């Protein structure tokens, strides 16, 4: 699955994105070239024996006929778990290079299928894939392959899913061990009364993080049996963040408001985040500023690109048009913090994407950056307007620019100096 299958972009823009990535890190290209050597050392005949799989991937191109695969880190069986996207990546302080190098080591052994074929099947390739998805640790699998892998890296310009590395067509897949499946996951599989949203919330309330739930949902292992479907990875990430966000909003919207205006900041792999919480009923907005020369805005001569989406007290009913998965990931982080405190607030998140963010690594970095922002030192302000003005001092745009794009900022009283 190539970049142009994720997003409609002009050919010259696609070329510019590739040029930017190659210019920023030749090490990733070198890593792809060494993958072939590791692959040939690992494969016996035409099968990959003893590969340890930490996760799966479901594509979205040609939906409902999709490419679905089992991910295996070739030559890295002992630390297979570290190759799967998780909150631990933030704790490790991974770089963009680290993410791309780990993902280029993951062989995507895939085959085409209809999303409806999963139903309650536990046999064959789809059955093995599902076992990998619901297990709470990497599973040893034996995969029969047709030919050598295609050495390429698919990185989505929408930056929702983590990049996917080399891929090969799979003839078969079999378990080489009995996977360990948590009892709570077994319960959601056996209880046919739950819809997918209810099952997601059940697992989340009992300590499962979004990463685990996303993989289980993507494999078609949640919901009523006749309604179970494979869910493309990109869609499942957003669906889980959105579903859990709606649940948490319901928990906080009747709580007491925060007492004063609070400002939090965090920075991670070329992204800077500001979170402003102010007294009042629940309201949320995400503003994104994307610098020229970044993967989002590759023309170095272009101006700063601004995008924004928001919701009021009752939430959203329409599609998030401009900020996509980043909106749901950042909102979840804010709502988790408020729910833990037993408070509600009106919340403004500002994300500044610098030109250091040269390759899209997925919305996990947004989710974790917001989650950890609240662990840092908090600043305060007299009013919401003062907080926005204070934060704007650190942004490459004026308050007037924000007011033109942001509904929440547009409500501030205008001062002549805001146009400076």
Curated annotation (Swiss-Prot):
The keyword DNA repair is assigned to this record: yes
InterPro entries assigned to the protein according to its UniProt record, in alphabetical order: Nre, Nre_C, Nre_DNA_repair, Nre_N
GO biological process, one term: DNA repair
Pfam families xref list: Nre_C, Nre_N
Knockout consequences: Non-essential, but cells lacking this gene are sensitive to DNA damage induced by treatment with MMC. Does not display increased sensitivity to UV light or to the alkylating agent methyl methanesulphonate (MMS).
Keyword DNA repair attached: yes
Protein keywords: DNA damage, DNA repair
Function of the protein: Involved in DNA damage repair. Works together with the UvrABC proteins in repairing DNA damage resulting from exposure to the DNA damaging agent mitomycin C (MMC).
Family: Belongs to the Nre family.
Protein name: DNA repair protein NreA
The species this protein was found in: Haloferax volcanii (strain ATCC 29605 / DSM 3757 / JCM 8879 / NBRC 14742 / NCIMB 2012 / VKM B-1768 / DS2) (Halobacterium volcanii)
């Amino acid at each position: 699955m190539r970049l142009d299958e994720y997003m409609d972009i002009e050919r010259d823009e696609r070329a510019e994105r590739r040029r930017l990535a190659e210019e920023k890190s030749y090490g990733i290209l070198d890593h792809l070239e060494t993958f072939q050597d590791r692959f040939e050392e690992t494969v016996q005949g035409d099968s990959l024996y003893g590969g340890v799989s930490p996760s799966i991937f479901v594509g979205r191109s040609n939906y409902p006929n999709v490419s679905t695969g089992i991910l295996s880190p070739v030559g890295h069986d002992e630390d297979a778990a570290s190759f799967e996207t998780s909150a631990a990546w933030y704790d490790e302080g991974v770089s963009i290079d680290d993410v791309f190098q780990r993902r280029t080591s993951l062989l995507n052994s895939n085959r085409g299928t209809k999303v409806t074929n999963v139903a309650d099947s536990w046999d064959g390739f789809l059955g093995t894939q599902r076992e990998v998805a619901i297990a709470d640790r990497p599973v040893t699998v034996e995969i029969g392959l047709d030919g050598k892998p295609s050495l390429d890296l698919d990185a989505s310009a929408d930056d929702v899913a983590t990049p996917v590395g080399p891929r090969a067509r799979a003839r078969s897949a079999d378990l080489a061990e009995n996977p360990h499946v948590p009892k709570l996951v077994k319960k959601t599989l056996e209880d046919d009364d739950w819809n997918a949203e209810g099952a997601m919330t059940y697992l989340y309330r009992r300590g499962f993080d979004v990463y685990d739930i996303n993989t289980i949902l993507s494999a078609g292992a949640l919901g009523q049996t006749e309604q179970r479907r494979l869910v493309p990875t990109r869609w499942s990430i957003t669906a889980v963040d959105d579903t859990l966000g709606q649940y948490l909003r319901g928990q906080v919207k009747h709580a007491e408001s925060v007492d004063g205006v609070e400002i939090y900041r965090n920075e991670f792999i070329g992204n800077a985040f500001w979170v402003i919480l102010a007294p009042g009923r629940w309201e949320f907005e995400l503003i994104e500023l994307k610098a020229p020369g970044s993967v989002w805005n590759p023309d170095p001569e272009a101006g700063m690109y601004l995008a924004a989406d928001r919701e009021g007290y009752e939430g959203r009913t329409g599609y998030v048009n401009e900020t996509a998965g980043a909106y749901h990931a950042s909102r979840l982080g804010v709502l988790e913090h408020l729910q833990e405190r037993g408070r509600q607030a009106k919340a403004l998140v500002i994300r500044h994407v610098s030109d250091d963010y040269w390759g899209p690594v997925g919305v996990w970095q947004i989710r974790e950056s917001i989650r950890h922002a609240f662990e840092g030192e908090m600043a305060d302000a007299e009013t919401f307007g003062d907080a926005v003005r204070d934060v704007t001092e650190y942004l490459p745009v004026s308050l007037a620019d924000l007011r033109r794009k942001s509904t929440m900022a547009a409500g501030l009283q205008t001062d002549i100096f805001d146009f400076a």
